[in-house]
């Protein structure tokens, strides 16, 4: 054996059984240690650090006493073991034994020196090395901002929406819309377009569909198939850090150890939860079935399926803000008490097969997929819709996501330089949004308002006759055909292929370890979209449509990174330095704004004038004087739609009249006065110069960046760790930000333009924090674990959607009114600062937890280039007829610019017409949980208190308060009837509080469920 301070002697793996007597008075502790299994991933390293890792991953208390571990190196331990088998494997043939004891009802291991001269008696249970009562102990001994959501925590209250999985995590929120199953995650105020790397088993979920900019990035995940969720906030240094400015969230699926019990080759787990009748409040059924088998020593397979059925639900009846649940109806306000169109049907599947190639390496194939159907709805309106609520159902939606991966791992026990992980994966997410046919409130000429007659008229005149598919229709007829009488199916797809490779090499120098983690990551996202139309089940193609959905553009973006991190640590300190180089490339097609000359034919001008009055919606004859005008203009509009110019000329020459409400006959009113009864003279063809137009444009952009990071931690006592970090990160523009183009659906209120000049975002983040673990706080053997931190992220060129951009050639010197939209870079620094806290208390029969997030500072300010694509050609730099220049040009010269265009290109203007989540400061939030374990720990019950602060959406520009302060209470319980059966019950929102989830989708404003009661059962074999 080498002496302490030199390289430690490895303890080879061995089947040699050490004598391990159980402590007196604890005959059942050994059986409990045999039954409990854990998934371990512990490399060969100094024994002291190895047993620390064992305690953390096993979730047990471990005591060293006087045992000297400095001369030993552990055996690498990976895979699923019982607690006893795992510790035996870790210790190998070292002369170290253990005793099992119980402190305050908790399972504990105490190490014993069984070597020559060693004392085999049980030493005093001091000092404590580590106490690991749950897997979350990994949180409180990690010198960084990391949180873990365990399966136990997921099971306390049924998960209706995936956003509930991370709602208790500090620094994390979700722009949840409870009518839409898509999950969007916000970390420290940042979200969308990959700022948060959202993953399932390390596979990126990069799907994006555009809407009202509340969720530009969604994933679909089923909580029934998960074992835990790992949340890292801030700069991510390892293999999952590419392009992630805010952090990462990895939802990890069930593993073999979650289904197979120790010593069993076959395992089955069945779960089911349902709402309790009327009190279930929309929880119809949530359940799953998982089975696993071990074939010999080298092959394991597992399969699982799940189903989730959620319905509409009632909102709370107490609290809330006066009028919060009311909408306008017939000049007054009415209240609504439920959320319509929240029903969702989700089916998911999971499959894994692991082949153990040798003791050191394995190959894993995995698949996880989900399919969910739900309603395609509008955002909340201030007026009552047909449902009696703010929401209107537009149609149906279907989402399907499939993820495949192949993982290879090798970690030789005798080679500390090799700890290699390789992953190749593919993810495909498809969403279909089907919009059912709609019809106007009145016939275009105001002739009638009966809904059935309107539908019959449009179907017969435009669709059944095939008129909407003929190329010679007027512009107005084209608008009719695009909007009414036809169903539209938007199909969106994102395909992601990725490759990850990282290795960790370790060098042991006595009690100090130097590790190097290095590797590469590459992934590519390919987005496609199309539209299909149908009328009464027949596929049609309205004239003027292409089948493309430019608001969800087609393109490809690839990103790659190479990284390394060096870490030096011992029992007192940890210091690390990392460096990564990342590069991206984006290619796609879009349309950029420009100018053109537009030719208006005689028929075009006639149709424009006639139909502007004859198609005034919502009015019928004799309802008001305007309808009398419509009764004359209507025939003119119909003639324009028919396109018969000879009939138009005859009708125009007839000088139509109408009778007003007083019975007086009046001549046909023409804006500006009737000038000629000759159709050809009155409506002259015209060429309009300098008209806005869109031109096809191929985008190909690429860039790279070097990103350093530093961190350090010290542990001055056995209960305190203080850490700090600083690092740079970036995020290149996404496909939608560069390529999206089109008009707001239906009403055309806004025009959206691409920004192929968008610059990458860059940020600097620094944070400080502390971990503490106190023992014997209130009871013998209890522990109190706390993590607190401060973060400060400052981002440059943060991309946001501006609603008032100026197009090239507009000749404007200030921003227009909202309506012209594009993604632009914020020329003001965007700041995100706050405090995070979480803690746990564990005393065996009683336990608790808490978390809190407080955001500092006010809402961010947003400034943009006056011309985001450049000012372009303009009239101010053109000389007048006398050779002089306009005043604007002269002012630019006086300011030191060579032209007005140069001045305009250099201007930055500040405004807050921002249309996405960045305009809103996240709300403060917190949770407090207290639980007890009774009846020999078979009964586990507790209460959870939830708090959310208030928040505004675009407060500086007159935006309204969307999120109001609230508190709620939940109760949960589980009873382990025997080794195979566990019963579960919960009551969510006990006080039936009315509230909108804090920092949820500001446009959807879907209320959270009121009081909900659920019962469940889990059966394992």
Enumerate the predicted regions with their spans.
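Extracytoplasmic beta-strand/coil segments of soluble accessory domains associated
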Residues: 110, 163, 167-204, 233
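Short acidic/polar hinge/loop motifs at secondary-structure boundaries
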Residues: 205-235
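Membrane-embedded beta-barrel scaffold of Gram-negative outer-membrane proteins
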Residues: 272, 419-435, 715, 721-727, ...
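Transmembrane beta-barrel wall of Gram-negative outer-membrane proteins
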Residues: 279-310, 314-315, 319-377, 400-404, ...
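Gram-negative outer-membrane beta-barrel transporters
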Residues: 569-575, 584, 778-799, 803-955, ...
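C-terminal beta-signal and adjacent terminal beta-strands/loops
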Residues: 730, 794-797, 801-803, 844-846, ...
């Amino acid at each position: 054996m080498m002496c302490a301070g030199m390289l430690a002697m490895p303890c080879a793996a061995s089947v040699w059984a050490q004598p391990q007597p159980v402590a007196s008075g604890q005959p059942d502790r050994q059986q409990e240690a045999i039954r409990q299994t854990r998934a371990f991933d512990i490399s060969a390293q100094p024994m002291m650090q190895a047993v620390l890792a064992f305690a953390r991953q096993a979730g047990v208390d471990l005591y060293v006493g006087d045992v000297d571990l400095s001369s030993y190196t552990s055996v690498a331990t990976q895979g699923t073991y019982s607690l006893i088998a795992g510790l035996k494997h870790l210790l190998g043939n070292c002369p170290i034994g253990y005793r099992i004891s119980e402190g305050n009802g908790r399972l504990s291991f105490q190490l014993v020196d069984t070597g020559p001269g060693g004392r085999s008696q049980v030493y005093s249970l001091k000092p404590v090395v580590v106490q690991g009562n749950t897997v979350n102990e990994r949180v409180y001994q990690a010198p960084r901002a990391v949180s873990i959501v365990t399966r136990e925590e997921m099971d306390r209250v049924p998960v209706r929406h995936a956003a509930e999985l991370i709602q208790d995590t500090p620094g994390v929120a979700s722009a949840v819309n409870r009518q839409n199953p898509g999950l969007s995650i916000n970390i420290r105020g940042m979200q969308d377009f990959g700022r948060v790397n959202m993953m399932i088993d390390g596979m990126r979920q990069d799907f994006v569909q555009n809407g009202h900019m509340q969720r530009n990035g969604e994933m679909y995940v089923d909580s029934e198939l998960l074992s835990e969720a790992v949340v890292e906030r801030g700069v991510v240094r390892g293999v999952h850090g590419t392009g992630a400015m805010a952090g990462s969230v990895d939802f990890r699926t069930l593993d073999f150890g979650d289904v197979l019990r120790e010593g069993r080759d076959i395992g089955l787990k069945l779960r089911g939860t349902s709402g309790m009748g009327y009190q279930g409040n929309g929880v119809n059924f949530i359940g799953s079935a998982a089975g696993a088998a071990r074939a010999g020593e080298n092959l394991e397979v597992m399969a699982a399926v799940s189903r989730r059925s959620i319905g509409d639900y009632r909102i709370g009846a107490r609290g809330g803000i006066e009028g919060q649940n009311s909408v306008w109806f017939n000049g007054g306000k009415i209240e609504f008490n439920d959320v319509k169109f929240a029903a969702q049907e989700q089916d998911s599947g999971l499959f894994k097969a692991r082949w153990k190639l040798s003791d050191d390496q394995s190959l894993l194939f995995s698949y996880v997929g989900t399919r969910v159907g739900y309603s395609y709805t509008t955002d909340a309106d201030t007026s009552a819709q047909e449902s009696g609520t703010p929401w209107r159902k537009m149609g149906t939606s279907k989402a399907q996501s499939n993820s495949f991966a192949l993982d290879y791992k090798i970690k030789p026990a005798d080679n500390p330089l090799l700890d290699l992980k390789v992953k190749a994966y593919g993810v495909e997410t498809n969403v279909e949004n089907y919009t059912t046919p709609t019809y106007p409130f009145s016939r275009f000429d105001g002739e009638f308002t009966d809904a059935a007659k309107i539908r019959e008229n449009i179907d017969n005149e435009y669709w059944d006759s095939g008129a909407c598919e003929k190329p010679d229709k007027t512009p107005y007829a084209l608008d009719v055909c695009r909007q009414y009488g036809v169903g539209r199916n938007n199909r969106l797809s994102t395909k992601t292929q990725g490759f990850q490779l990282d290795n960790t090499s370790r060098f042991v120098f006595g009690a100090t370890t130097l590790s190097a983690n290095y590797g590469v990551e590459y992934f590519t996202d390919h987005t496609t979209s199309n539209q299909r139309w149908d009328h009464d089940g027949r596929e049609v193609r309205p004239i003027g449509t292409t089948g493309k959905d430019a608001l969800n553009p087609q393109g490809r973006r690839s990103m790659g990174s190479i990284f390394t991190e060096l870490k030096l640590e011992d029992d007192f300190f940890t210091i690390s330095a990392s460096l990564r180089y990342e590069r991206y490339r984006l290619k796609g097609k879009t349309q950029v704004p420009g100018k053109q000359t537009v030719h208006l034919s005689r028929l075009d001008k006639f149709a424009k004038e006639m139909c502007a009055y004859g198609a005034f919606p919502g009015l019928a004859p004799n309802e008001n004087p305007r309808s009398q005008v419509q009764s004359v203009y209507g025939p003119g509009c119909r003639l324009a739609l028919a396109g018969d110019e000879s009939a138009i000329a005859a009708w125009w020459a007839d000088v139509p009249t109408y009778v007003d409400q007083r019975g007086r006959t009046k001549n046909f009113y023409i804006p500006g006065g009737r000038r000629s009864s000759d159709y050809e003279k009155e409506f002259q063809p015209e060429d309009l110069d300098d008209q806005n137009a869109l031109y096809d444009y191929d985008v190909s952009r690429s860039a790279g960046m070097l990103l350093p990071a530093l961190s350090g931690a010290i542990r001055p006592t056995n209960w305190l760790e203080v850490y700090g970090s600083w690092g740079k990160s970036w995020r290149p523009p996404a496909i939608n930000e560069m390529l999206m183009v089109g008009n707001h659906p239906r009403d055309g209120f806004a025009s959206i333009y691409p920004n192929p000049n968008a610059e990458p975002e860059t940020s600097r983040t620094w944070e400080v924090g502390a971990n503490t673990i106190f023992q014997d706080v209130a009871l013998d053997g209890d522990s109190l674990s706390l993590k607190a931190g401060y973060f400060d992220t400052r981002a440059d060129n943060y991309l946001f959607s501006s609603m008032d951009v100026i197009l090239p050639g507009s000749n404007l010197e200030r921003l227009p009114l909202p309506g012209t939209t594009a993604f632009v870079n914020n020329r003001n620094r965007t700041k995100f600062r706050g405090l995070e806290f979480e803690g746990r208390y564990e005393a065996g029969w009683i336990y608790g937890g808490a978390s809190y997030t407080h955001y500092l500072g006010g809402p961010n300010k947003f400034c943009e280039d006056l011309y985001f694509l450049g000012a372009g050609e303009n009239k101010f730099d053109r000389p007048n007829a006398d050779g002089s220049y306009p005043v604007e040009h002269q002012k630019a010269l006086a300011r030191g610019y060579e032209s007005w265009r140069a001045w305009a290109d250099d201007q930055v203007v500040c405004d807050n017409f921002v249309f996405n989540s960045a305009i809103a400061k996240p709300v403060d939030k917190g949770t407090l949980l207290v639980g007890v374990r009774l009846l020999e720990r078979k009964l586990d019950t507790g209460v959870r208190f939830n708090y959310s602060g208030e928040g505004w959406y675009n407060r500086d520009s007159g935006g309204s308060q969307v999120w109001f302060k609230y508190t709620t209470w939940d109760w949960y319980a589980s009873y382990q009837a025997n080794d195979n059966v566990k019963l579960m019950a919960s009551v969510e929102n006990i006080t039936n509080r009315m509230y909108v989830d804090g920092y949820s989708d500001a446009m959807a404003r879907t209320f959270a469920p009121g009081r909900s009661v659920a019962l469940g059962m889990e059966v394992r074999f």
